Amino acid sequence: MSDQNGEVNLEQVDVAVIGSGIAGLFLAVECARSGLKVAVVTKKEVSMSSTNWAQGGIAGVLDPNDLEGLESHVRDTLDAGSGLCDEEVVRSVITEASDRIRDLIGHGVQFDHNSSGGYDMAIEGGHSGARIFHTRDRTGAEIERALTEAASDETDTNLTILENWMAVDLIQRVHGDPVQGVSGVWCLSPEGVVWTLPSRVVVLATGGAGMMHKATTNPSIATGDGVAMASRSGADIRDMEFIQFHPTALHSNNPRPFLITEALRGHGAILMTIQEYSTWKTNGAGIDPSKHSFMVNYSPMGSLGT
């Protein structure tokens, strides 16, 4: 519908979520189930997210009473962060991980089990022990599947999903004054019409900006839209270099190279340069190949370092 100013308005919602990856869909489903009216705005199909491309898994200690395991996870994270981590945030995320993983399981995510019936825990870079929940090497796709189905269950009641709609900009309550917050978002419909989506709360869950780099394992939608909208609205931006960065990929001339899961290093893969590999093949009979890896110069964990 159009208002007296000629703007085309969507129905007001309690929460507008921009993005349909694990963060956006999880929040949208939880809010809808609590009785809030929610709209998810996603510029491609709902499953087109970086979450869907993620392979390895999710780190967490499922038993909240395993204090030693939790503390080990905290130490590993702080060590991997090289002094850049906010310890309070690290402890909060790791402590709450068990609840969030159980929530995902409750939403239908099927993590792999071992022959004993427990979860098949893997090791990845930076971890000193096996604490990675995974679904084969397609964990992200499994999470996206489950959350998409959970969202579909809510679409007839409190949840609306706007696929192929592009969030253009945040609507500030007072233009030029970020302290007053936002009152909605302008969206571009598939037909090229700009609509106003009024909302009590707007959540930016738009993922990373991998496409700004020459090579990235992110999908083509990772263009930093949410960060740009937040910046234009006066929000403080920090730590951009750490968003959605994956360290290992198969080299090619393709601008989006094939992602190599961190789980390979957990299973013993060694990071080596071509020269190091050649030296080991020529002179390394009987020598542990990890001794030739450049990673021994940077981390006591060798190829598991981050």
Q: For each of these PLM feature ranges, what is it?
A:
Residues V201-F258:
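Glycine-rich loop(s) and the adjacent beta-strand/alpha-helix scaffold that form part
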Residues I105-V193, P198, A205, A249-S252, ...:
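Conserved redox-cofactor binding core of oxidoreductases
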Residues R33-A54, N65:
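Glycine-rich FAD pyrophosphate-binding loop
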Residues G60-V93:
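Glycine-rich active-site loop/strand segments that organize a redox cofactor
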Residues A235-T306:
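An anion/pyrophosphate-binding glycine-rich loop and adjacent beta-alpha core
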Residues V15-V40:
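N-terminal Rossmann-like FAD-binding beta1-loop-alpha1 element of flavoenzymes
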Residues A80-M121:
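Rossmann-like flavin
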Residues M1-V15, R33, Q180, V193:
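Extreme N-terminal leader/targeting segments of oxidoreductases
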